[in-house]
Amino acid sequence: MNYKKISLLSVVFCSIAVTSMRAQEEEDYSQYANVEATGTPTKTYCTSKIVGGSPSKLISFGYDFQGPSTLTARSFSAPLGQSYPWEKADIEYNSGLRVMASIPVISNTKWIVTLGANLAETKYAFASGTVAANPLIATLKENGLTTMGLNTTIFKPLNAKNFILTQASADWNGDFALGKMPTANQLKVSAALLYGWKKTDKQMFAIGVSRTYRGGQQLYVPIILYNKTFNSKWGVECLLPARGNIRYTVNSRNMLFAGFELEGNSYRLNNMMKDYNSPYSALELRRSEIRARLTYEFSVYKFWWLSVQAGYRLNYKYNMDDGEFYGSEKDFVAENSLTNPFYMMVTLNLVSP
């Protein structure tokens, strides 16, 4: 009797299992065709880097050395009748510290904001016997030129393909030595605004406008950003007309660059005016140069990289002017000339991962 019950229950369970399997095989999945996802699609944003690009420098400590050159300081007369003589002086070398920091304070998919500071000094070692009768040569010999400032960069991706990039800096430029406090009238403000496209992870392109002093005086110029990695070895990194580089990647820890950079600023000569009791109220040195260069950058330990740069400094402008009047057609107080030396710069850099 028990065996009959067990056999009957086995037949029932087997029938239910077979029926269930057939039901699964014959189920009409078309009923799910119109089901929609309830979640909102995640929006993607482009990044500020390209694949294969050079690592971003967070902190840099450097030393700049320029070889022998000759400065010809033209004579000039002051409004009250004073006259300052023409003088030609040999410079044995220029040297100075280069320090930079650019630290991200906000870094997420929607915003990247960095705050930074910079210091660049140029000391003048004139040949022995230099008279320094011309006020410009005298202040360069005594004080040199110094730039120190603060800056910020904001990268705002709009979507996966477009972005806005803004930069702003406030620099104090003048004939003051390192350790001396600059004054308010030595402040210069620069800024840039670009709109860009990132079509692939290996290419960025942007156009915009910049207020800059790289040409030695206040200028408003169009600018172009173009960063592209062509293959595993070659690429370009440009922000025209300020700088441009062809990049060759030896491996992930060694890179070579060939290119140029336009360097310059307008320096308020407060010490020169004070020492010579000048009747001019706003004498400035309009300094600008083009540096054609080769650079080798390599990792020395983890994220610490060394950069060795060598090239030729081409003087573009070294004139003295009174006041800062954008678009002014008045003549320079003195149109000076400066010959072109070779130069070398070495920097130790902490780079981003």
Question: Where are the regions a protein language model picked out?
Answer:
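Cleavable N-terminal export/targeting peptides
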Residues: 1-53, 352-353
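Outer-membrane beta-barrel "beta-signal"
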Residues: 224-227, 296-302, 306, 337-353
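Residue-level signature of outer-membrane beta-barrel architecture
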Residues: 101-105, 152-156, 197, 228, ...
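Hydrophobic, lipid-facing positions within transmembrane beta-strands of outer-membrane proteins
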Residues: 57, 93-99, 146-152, 172, ...
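Short sequence motifs at beta-strands and strand-loop junctions characteristic
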Residues: 87-95, 140-146, 183-187, 216-218, ...
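Transmembrane beta-barrel domains of bacterial outer-membrane proteins
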Residues: 27-163, 167-180, 188
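Transmembrane beta-strands of outer-membrane beta-barrel pores
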Residues: 63-69, 117-125, 170-176, 209-215, ...
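Outer-envelope beta-barrel architecture signal
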Residues: 53-59, 109-115, 160-166, 201-205, ...
